[in-house]
Amino acid sequence: MAPGPAEPPGASSPPPPQTERSRWENGWVWALAVLLPLRLLSAASAPIMDCDETFNYWEPLRYLSYQGSGGGMQTWEYSPTYALRSYLYIELHGLVLRIGRALASLDDVQSFYWLRSGLAVVSAGSEAAFCAATADSLGPRVGALTLAFMAPASGMFHASVALLPSTTCMYCVLLGFAAWLRGRHVLGLMCGSLAVLLAWPFVALAFVPMGLDALRPSALGFAGVVGVAAAAILAFGCLPALFDGWYYATGRPVSAVANLILYNALGQGGGGRGADLYGTEPFSFYVKNLLLNFNLVAPLGLLAGPALAAIPAEGRWRRLLAVSPAYLVLLLFGSMAHKEERFLTPIYPLLCLSAAAVLDTALGVAERGAVAFGLTRRPRARAVCNSLLVLLALAAAALSASRSMALHVNFRAPLRIYEHLYYHAAGPAAPPRAGSVCIGKEWYRFPSSFFLPRWGPGGAVSPLLWLNSSFTGQLPRPFEPWPGGISVVPPHMNDRNEEEPSRYSQLSDCAFVVDLELPQQEEPTLDRAAWEPLACEPFLDAERSRLPWRAFHLPFGISQRRNAYAEYCVWRRKGR
C-alpha cells in the first residue's frame, strides 16, 4: 500500500462524490467541536470507576508532584521488590500537572480537575483525528456514524478522562489507526509501540493487523517494520527501563511492562495465581458491560465481522482488516479469568467504527440493489434509509446520555463529599489544627489525596487512616518520607492480597470519618452522641434498586422514585 489516502486499509469502493467529500474537508475541526465540550463535561462530572485508578496512578502522582508534602498512598505494585508500575508513566502526567500549577495558582482540587481536563483535550483531539481519517478513507458516512456513535457513548464518558494505562492505550489506538487509515504506517506503528511498551502490554494484539499490513512490500516491507520496531524498543522500552531503574534504585534497568506480564499472564507472583487473586468473571461480564456502555452500538459492532464477511461488497476484506483488532483484544481478555471493565477501553473506538462500517456496507449493498432494479428514481426509499440511520444514532445517543447521567447522579457523592471536606478546611470556620480523615469499608471509593484537607495556605495535609471493616484484603500504606519513598522497600507488603493488620487505626485517632450507611452493612454505625454530619450526598443502594432503573436515569423524578438511596457522609467529631 502506497503511503497516502489513495488506498488505505478498509477503503470503501468508489470514492465518495465531491459534494459528500467537501463536508469533511475540515472534518477534524468539526469533530473536535462536537467532542471537546462533551469530554470536558466528562472531566467535570464523571465518577472514578475503579480504585486502581486512584491508588496506582493518582496517589503516586500526588506523591511525586508534591515531593511528599501532599501525602500519597503506596500499593505493593510500587515496592521495588515487585516494580509492576512505571514511574516514567506517572511523571509524564506530572508534567501536565506542574504546567498547570506554574500557569495559575491552583489548589489541590483544582489541580485534579486540571489534569482531568488535559486528558479530556487529548481524548477529544485523538477521537477527532480518528473520525476524520475514517471519513477520508472509508467514506463520509462511516466517519459521520463513527462520530455519532462514539461522541455520546457512556463508555467514552468515563473512560476518556481516566488516569489509566488502558485509556492511554485508547488514545494510541485512535491516533495510530488514524495514521494507518491514511497509509502512514510508521506513525501508526510508533503509536502502537508507545501503548505496548510504556502503557499496557496486553493491547499488543490490537496492532497486529496494522503490523501485518505494514509488511507488504508496497507499504514498509520487512526491513522497514524491523527498523520501526528497533527504534520503538529503544525509545519506549530501553529508556523507560533505565529511568525506572534509577527511580527504584535497583542498580539495574527495571522493565515494569515485563514484570506486569510475568505477574498477570504467566502467574509468577501472587502465590502462582497472579491477577486471579482479585476475582474472576465469566465472559458474559464483558457482554453486559459493552451493552451498558454502548447499548445499540455494541451488538452492531460485535456482529460486524461476520456481517462484513458475508455481505458481498467491494473492499469488504479491507474493512475486515480494519475492524479485526477489536475481536482479537476481546478474545484475549475474554479468555482470561480475571476481568475488568477497563480492559476493553482500548477497543471502544473500534467498536464504534465496526458498527458504522457494517451499517454503511449494508446500505451500500441496498443502494446498488436499487440501481439494479431501477429504483433510483424513488428518492423516498433513500430518504427512509437515511432517516432510519438518524433514528438509530439518536436512540443510541439517548440511551448513552441516560446511562451517563445515571453514573453521575448515582455515584457522584464521593467526589462531592471530599471536595466539601477540602474546602471546609480552607474556610474561615475551620479549626486551627489538622485532623485525620478515616475510612472503613468505603476505602475503594476514595478519590485521591488531592481531596484531603490542607489546613491553612501551604499547611499540613490531613493524614489518611484506615479503619477495620469487612474487607480482608491488603490496603495501601503511606509512602515513606520524600524522597526515600520511591526506592525504599516498604515493610508489611505482599503480592498475595493478604490482609495487613498494621494498616488499621482506631476510631479515637479520627477527626473525620467518611462512610456510607446501608441497612444491610456489617459494620456498626457511628455514635451520634460523638459525631455529627459535616456534609451528606445521596448514593445509590444497588442491592435495593432494580434494573433497569438503577442502570439508566429517567427524568421527572422517575429514577428517584424507583431506586433506593443511602446517605454518603463525612462525619465530624463533635467539638472540632
Features from the language model and the residues they span:
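Start-transfer (signal-anchor) and selected internal transmembrane alpha helices
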Residues: M1-R39, V228-A235
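Extracytosolic helix-loop segments that constitute the early lumenal/periplasmic catalytic or substrate-binding loops
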Residues: L38-L40, N56-L84, L88-E91, L95-L103
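Short acidic/glycine- and proline-prone juxtamembrane loop motifs at membrane-interface regions
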Residues: D50-C51, H158-T168, E341
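Transmembrane-helix motifs of polytopic, lipid-linked glycan transferases
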Residues: Y113-V142
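Short helix- or helix-capping micro-motifs
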Residues: T146-S154, G192, V196
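Transmembrane-lumen/periplasm boundary regions of multi-pass, lipid-linked membrane glycan transferases
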Residues: S166, C191-K339, R377, A395, ...
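Membrane-interface transmembrane helices that cradle and orient dolichyl/undecaprenyl
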Residues: L174-L187, A195
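Membrane-embedded, lumen/periplasm-facing catalytic core of multi-pass transferases
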Residues: A366-E517, W531-D541, L547-G575
